[in-house]
């Protein structure tokens, strides 16, 4: 007999589905081990078992960033205590990018992402109904897994589905929204954007409008230049006239740029660096170690961590050289596929408020952009230049 379910899963792609689920899974632990690392180890094991080779010469800007990180870490290890586990994890992250992206099929990935989007939006709807009934909601959990860190609020009036916080949900949705815009599936993109508005994530709301603006800027057809601004106006109207979005709008209006820790703490810490350190970074392995040494005393600690946005954290730990290589890794993707402009623009802007850095979220985004960019390049939808 024909295995119908097997054929259906095959059309999606098991590897692609697992990859699409990574942003959800990496927020949990399995038996005390963080899935943010385990998911990439599992994918590497699958690749090695299948006999695929790692293509280190595939995307040179990323390879240069990886080499700089390794040399920099070795030098810092001679002067400060380096977390060995974190160092091994970072090596695995870089290996995962080089190994995974050549194996993913864009069509199967698109289907897998759409299915995961439907699942997380269903979770969002469930939480929203719970808020309507009880006035608050619990974070959704996955049976057999534990949350990797305690949430600041066990109960919340802001839904986030299976993610740790609304900002994490918004970060995940950036990629499907970008893909929907690239495919000109405007209705699907609007649905995804509205789901981000449901979370009341300030970063998510701002980023969605940035992506729409960047995508409109790229359009040459007069119809698109008229339709997209109308959609943006409609979204703004929805934000201001529907009570379901009230929390997000209030949060956006009440955000004090001058006092918000997420926006100001990084600038303060970097301001305590000495002249020569701006080139290659400070001789400390983390912002926490740097601040605890007495170099920056007026900071707020989150356990054994100091929150700093990606932009400032890169300057602190890796200097302007590291920041330059990081940005070139993103900018050079535009040579492969100009249609990635809205997504890359959003990622660069959120560097001032988000903490993606070189984490597992960076791995996920890079793999996605390389898969999409390479496919569009091959089909001559984007630039005809291939990876060098």
Residue ranges and their predicted role:
Residues 1-71, 376-388:
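Transmembrane signal-anchor hairpin modules in multi-pass inner-membrane enzymes, especially those
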Residues 132-158, 288-311:
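Interfacial juxtamembrane loops and adjacent helix segments
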Residues 131, 216-255:
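A membrane-periplasm/extracellular boundary helix in multi-pass inner-membrane enzymes
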Residues 40-44, 342-351, 357-388:
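Transmembrane alpha-helices of multi-pass inner-membrane enzymes
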Residues 251-318:
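Long extracytoplasmic/lumenal interhelical loops at the membrane interface
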Residues 61-70, 80-103:
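Aromatic-anchored transmembrane helix interface
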Residues 114-138, 154-155, 161-200, 205-217:
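Alpha-helical transmembrane segments of multi-pass inner-membrane proteins
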Residues 3, 212-217, 222-227, 314-350:
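Hydrophobic transmembrane alpha-helices and their immediate junctions
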């Amino acid at each position: 007999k024909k295995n119908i379910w097997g054929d259906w899963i095959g059309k999606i792609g098991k590897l692609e589905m697992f990859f699409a689920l990574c942003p959800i899974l990496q927020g949990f632990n399995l038996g005390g081990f963080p899935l943010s690392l385990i998911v990439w180890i599992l994918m590497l094991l699958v690749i090695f078992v299948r006999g695929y080779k790692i293509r280190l010469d595939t995307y040179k800007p990323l390879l240069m960033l990886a080499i700089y990180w390794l040399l920099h870490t070795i030098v810092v290890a001679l002067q400060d205590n380096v977390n060995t586990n974190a160092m091994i994890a970072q090596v695995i992250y870089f290996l995962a990018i080089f190994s995974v992206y050549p194996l993913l099929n864009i069509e199967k990935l698109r289907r897998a992402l759409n299915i995961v989007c439907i699942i997380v939006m269903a979770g969002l709807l469930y939480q929203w109904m719970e808020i309507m009934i009880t006035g608050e909601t619990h974070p959704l959990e996955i049976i057999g897994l534990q949350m990797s860190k305690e949430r600041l609020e066990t109960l919340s009036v802001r839904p986030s589905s299976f993610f740790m916080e609304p900002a994490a949900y918004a970060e995940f949705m950036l990629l499907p929204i970008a893909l929907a815009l690239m495919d000109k599936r405007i209705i699907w993109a609007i649905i995804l954007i509205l789901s981000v508005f449901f979370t009341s994530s300030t970063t998510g709301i701002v980023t969605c409008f940035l992506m729409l603006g960047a995508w409109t800027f790229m359009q040459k057809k007069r119809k698109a230049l008229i339709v997209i601004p109308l959609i943006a106006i409609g979204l703004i109207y929805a934000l201001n006239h529907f009570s379901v979005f009230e929390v997000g709008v209030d949060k956006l209006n009440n955000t004090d740029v001058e006092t918000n820790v997420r926006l100001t703490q990084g600038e303060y810490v970097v301001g305590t660096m000495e002249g020569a350190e701006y080139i290659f970074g400070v001789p400390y392995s983390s912002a926490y170690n740097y601040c605890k040494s007495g170099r920056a005393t007026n900071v707020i600690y989150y356990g054994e961590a100091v929150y700093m946005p990606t932009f400032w954290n890169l300057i602190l730990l890796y200097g302007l050289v590291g920041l330059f290589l990081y940005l070139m890794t993103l900018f050079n993707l535009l040579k492969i596929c100009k249609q990635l402009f809205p997504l890359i623009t959003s990622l660069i802007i959120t560097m001032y408020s988000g903490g993606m850095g070189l984490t597992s979220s960076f791995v996920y985004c890079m793999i996605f952009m390389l898969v999409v960019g390479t496919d569009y390049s091959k089909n001559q939808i984007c630039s005809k230049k291939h990876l060098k």
